[in-house]
Each structure stands twice: as structure tokens, then as C-alpha cells.
Amino acid sequence: MNAPLGGIWLWLPLLLTWLTPEVNSSWWYMRATGGSSRVMCDNVPGLVSSQRQLCHRHPDVMRAISQGVAEWTAECQHQFRQHRWNCNTLDRDHSLFGRVLLRSSRESAFVYAISSAGVVFAITRACSQGEVKSCSCDPKKMGSAKDSKGIFDWGGCSDNIDYGIKFARAFVDAKERKGKDARALMNLHNNRAGRKAVKRFLKQECKCHGVSGSCTLRTCWLAMADFRKTGDYLWRKYNGAIQVVMNQDGTGFTVANERFKKPTKNDLVYFENSPDYCIRDREAGSLGTAGRVCNLTSRGMDSCEVMCCGRGYDTSHVTRMTKCGCKFHWCCAVRCQDCLEALDVHTCKAPKNADWTTPT
């Protein structure tokens, strides 16, 4: 009896290592490094060799990616603004989000998708703006073409989204491709879903040419939609994310519940249920909801009942300066007065034990 138990204890550390992802630094931290490309490439912890090579070889692309981090994190925070976990970032943490993304949850799925989408968007935009030496406008969009409105000429600058997707796949997926575990496959799937989401909203824009504004000739180009459209789309995918398990040969997924539909390449997938994010929990990486503003009249996720997890709330009476009495003056200005507005602000109470908790 002792021998089998001894064998179990011997293998337990290896089993836990396989099941639990390591707290790794990430290219997400590029936002915080700043400085020259060489400084950035050499000082972002956790980049694998192929990522560092791309970083040194394409400093202009890296600048676009690092500037784009702020954009997709802001979009993540916008989408989660009314939820207990609000996509808060930790400036001093190399993983940007701390331990909360160690869990293979819906939130992890969304962050990987929106970050991958953000890289595509940032690179493609930089190409169109002439900020990247290795790419420019889409070279395939030349000559004449036809759509439902008739013949048109490709002109202007079509966003070269294929280059953005190709570079994003090579850079973002590099670390995950070195892994063989379930979490690596989950991240790769959600990375791809994010890239596809940006391309989904590529739209054709046209300009008419002719006498008195007639559309005798049309010049058209392809342009990415505002990143908010991608964020809204991925938010819907987050709410419909599909829980999966690894298949028997370890090469893909199968649904965790046979009542679920099989995930497509556009869906987000996750393995583990999310924590409730109610209290500060060091192991889960949760900051809790103590002090968060809640909506007393809402019945949604931002309601005081849901946001505060039943702990109650404090009410503060505050005043703020607002614009009032606005009038339109010909021509062409709107003039307003500054008014003081009194309002009540409701914030979630802290739990009785407000310190970090460690689950037993």
C-alpha cells in the first residue's frame, strides 16, 4: 500500500506542473518598457527566441504593437466595466494581469482574443499610415473590380490586413506553439478567433467621381472598422463561450457537455469555471469588489446586489461640476453654463476580513 502512495506523491509535482500554467511574463508588458526598440526587445521578460528575433528585425512593427497594448486593454476594460472583474491591469506585474489569467476561464479566453485582435489592428493601421518599412497598403487591391453596384476601380489605400494577421500569428502564437499542453491549445484557438474578428469587420468604402456629384466612376478601398466593433463582437463571443475538454489524443477539444454545440474557429473556448471575484484572493488573483461603484437602480451585473456580492454598500453624497443650460448660438457654437450637481455615489462594502485570503 505504501509503494503506490509513494509513487503518487513522487508524480504529484509533475502532475500539478502540467495542469497549472506557470506565471509567465508576456509581450503584453511591452506597453510598460518604452524606450528604443533594442531596450524593449532585451527587457521584456518571457519572450521566446523567435519573438526576440522578430522584435530586433522589425522595430517599427514592435512600436506599433506596444502602442496598441493601451488600446486593446482599454477596450477590455470598457467591455468589463460593469462586471466584478473589470479587466484591471497591474503596472508592476510582468504578466500585466497578474494571477487571474492562470485559470483557463472565460476571462482568459477573452483577454487572449482581444489582445491578438489588437495586434492585428495596430500593425495593419501602422502599415496604412506608412510607419512600417516591410508593408504598405494592400498590393492586391489594384485595377478594376465589380460589386453589386457595378464596376469600380481600386484606389486610395486598402488596409493590408493579411500582413497584420500573418505577423500577429508569427509573433503572438510563437510562445504557445512551443507548448504541448491543454492551455497552449486553448490560447492558440482564442488568439485565432481574435485575429478573425478584426477581418470580419473589414468594409469597402467608396468615393464617387462625376459631374455634379454623379457616380459615373467609383474609387473604392478596404478599411478596418473602429476597434469597438471588434470588441463588441468578442464580448458577444465571451458571453457565448463554450466550455471544452481535451480530446483523448491531446490534439484538440471536445465539448464539456454534450448539450453544447461544437465550437467553431470564431468561438471562444475555456476549460475552467470562473471564480466569483467577490473578495481579494491572492491565489485566484482577484482584487475583489470592495470600493467598486455600483448602480442602485440597475438589475444587471453592475447592480449593488450583484456587484457587492450581497455585502451591502456605502452611500456618499458628492457634488460635481457639469454643463447645463446649453444653448445654440448662430452660427455656430453651443454655449453652456457650469452648474454644481449633487448626487449619491454607492460603493461596495468590504468583507469583514478585508485582507488577502488564501483558500484552505
From Swiss-Prot:
Keywords: Developmental protein, Disulfide bond, Extracellular matrix, Glycoprotein, Lipoprotein, Secreted, Signal, Wnt signaling pathway. GO terms for biological process: atrial cardiac muscle tissue morphogenesis; canonical Wnt signaling pathway; cardiac epithelial to mesenchymal transition; cardiac muscle cell proliferation; cell fate commitment; cell proliferation in midbrain; cell-cell signaling; cellular response to transforming growth factor beta stimulus. Belongs to the Wnt family. This is Protein Wnt-2. A lipid is attached at S212 (O-palmitoleoyl serine). The gene is WNT2. Ligand for members of the frizzled family of seven transmembrane receptors. Functions in the canonical Wnt signaling pathway that results in activation of transcription factors of the TCF/LEF family. Functions as a upstream regulator of FGF10 expression. Plays an important role in embryonic lung development. May contribute to embryonic brain development by regulating the proliferation of dopaminergic precursors and neurons. It holds the Pfam family wnt. Glycans are attached at N295. One of its GO terms (cellular component) is extracellular space. It is found in: Secreted, Extracellular space, Extracellular matrix; Secreted. It comes from Gorilla gorilla gorilla (Western lowland gorilla).
